[in-house]
């Protein structure tokens, strides 16, 4: 179920403060954040975020196409290394 329109998008306060400060100072340094749950708003266009994936920080450059998504959607937390059986079947044939 989608969030109510009257509530607006959720963005952590500390992330929004960093966005406003970066826009005001015209700063191009990436904003380091652990807040994967924050929604991307139009204020964030042109900024780079370092989003934590549980192990390291993944750089995410925000464009117009990212608006409305969450920051965490662009920093995958799992690495898929393939199914064990599929490799063995190819070797056996």
Swiss-Prot record:
The organism's place on the tree of life at top rank: Bacteria
Database matches in SUPFAM superfamilies: Ribosomal protein S19
Bilayer-crossing regions: none
Family under the similarity heading: Belongs to the universal ribosomal protein uS19 family.
Record keyword RNA-binding present: yes
Disulfide topology: none
Gene: rpsS
UniProt-recorded name of the protein: Small ribosomal subunit protein uS19
UniProt xrefs under Pfam families: Ribosomal_S19
A Gene Ontology term for the protein's cellular component: cytoplasm
HAMAP family documented for this protein: Ribosomal_uS19
Function: Protein S19 forms a complex with S13 that binds strongly to the 16S ribosomal RNA.
PANTHER family: RIBOSOMAL PROTEIN S19P FAMILY MEMBER, SMALL RIBOSOMAL SUBUNIT PROTEIN US19M
Organism: Campylobacter jejuni subsp. jejuni serotype O:2 (strain ATCC 700819 / NCTC 11168)
Keywords tagged on the record: Ribonucleoprotein, Ribosomal protein, RNA-binding, rRNA-binding
GO biological process: ribosomal small subunit assembly; translation
MF-aspect GO terms: rRNA binding; structural constituent of ribosome
């Amino acid at each position: 179920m989608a969030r109510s329109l009257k509530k607006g998008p959720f963005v952590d306060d500390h992330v929004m403060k960093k966005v406003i400060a970066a826009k005001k100072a015209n700063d191009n340094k990436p904003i380091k954040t652990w807040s994967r749950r924050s929604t991307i708003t139009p204020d964030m266009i042109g900024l780079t975020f370092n989003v934590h994936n549980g192990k390291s920080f993944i750089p995410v450059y925000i464009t117009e196409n990212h608006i409305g998504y969450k920051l965490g959607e662009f920093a995958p937390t799992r690495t898929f290394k393939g199914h064990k059986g599929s490799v063995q079947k190819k070797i056996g044939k």
